[in-house]
Design a protein with these regions (language model features):
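Conserved beta-sheet core of the metallophosphoesterase superfamily
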Residues: 1, 106-110, 115-213
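Core catalytic region of metal-dependent phosphoesterases/phosphodiesterases
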Residues: 1-88
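Short regulatory "switch" loops immediately downstream of catalytic or recognition motifs
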Residues: 38-47, 93-101, 142-156
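Short helix-terminating capping/connector loops at secondary-structure junctions
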Residues: 46-54, 105, 161-165
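Short, well-ordered helical secondary-structure segments
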Residues: 81, 97-100, 127, 191
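Active-site-proximal loop/helix segment associated with metal-binding centers of metalloenzymes
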Residues: 84-90, 96-106, 110, 174
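Polar, enzyme-active/binding microenvironments
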Residues: 217
Length: 217
């Protein structure tokens, strides 16, 4: 979970419009989220208790949570603890070690960042690579799911020479639509460009045998 799990555009927020909102309180939105994710949480809990592994690698919070003034960092940590999840704030590094029979087959570094601000999605993804070294960069703030695979140079000690490696940049997306029936909502009023993205997944695959990382959505 990369943040903005909850909408939290509540009364008092300049974007709030009563006719456009079905769930008006934190409790209602939290209950809806828990209900939709119940099956996933049960599977995650089973993996943790029986195999010591996390099905859900992490949960972050996004601007919809940390700017809401109704959810604190303590609330997020407590919620994650209750559900056997790891809370990673808004930015974090993850070190992935894929093993087979106790032997390390592939190690990759992931930089996960909820994201902030507006602008073009590709530029936002490229900005993640500034001052941060990783193999996979993931964000979710912008309402435009997309993925990019590219090569980057590095010095390979095993070859004692320069080399190149793959990098994956993914905006897993916060799904939205800028049009609603019978109500003129905030996203229709804010500008000329309408946004829409359907719910779905963006998949990153790690092939330890071929030492390849790929993405598709």
């Amino acid at each position: 979970f990369g943040g903005d799990q909850l909408d939290l555009i509540l009364p008092g927020d300049p974007r709030f419009k009563d006719e456009a909102v079905a769930l008006r309180t934190l409790a209602e939105q939290q209950d809806e989220f828990d209900e939709r994710c119940a099956e996933l949480f049960e599977e995650h809990d089973y993996y943790v208790k029986n195999y010591g592994m996390e099905k859900i690698w992490y949960m972050q919070w996004g601007n919809h949570e940390y700017k809401s003034r109704v959810v604190t960092e303590g609330d997020m940590k407590r919620y994650c603890k209750m559900n056997n999840m790891t809370f990673l704030g808004s930015k974090a590094f993850i070190r992935l070690d894929i093993q087979y029979k106790g032997k390390s087959m592939m190690k990759k570094t992931l930089f996960v960042n909820h994201g902030a601000g507006g602008g073009g999605t590709l530029k936002a993804l490229e900005n993640l690579t500034v001052n941060c070294e990783a193999d996979v960069y993931q964000m979710g703030h912008l309402h435009d799911p997309m993925g990019v695979k590219r090569d980057t140079f590095f010095y390979n000690d095993k070859k004692n020479s320069w080399d190149s490696k793959e990098q994956i940049l993914v905006n897993s997306g916060c799904f939205t639509t800028a049009v609603s029936n019978n109500v003129d909502q905030w996203m229709e009023q804010k500008g000329n460009k309408l946004q829409t993205s359907k719910p779905g997944t963006w998949t990153i695959s790690f092939d330890a045998y071929q030492q390849k990382v790929s993405q598709h959505g």
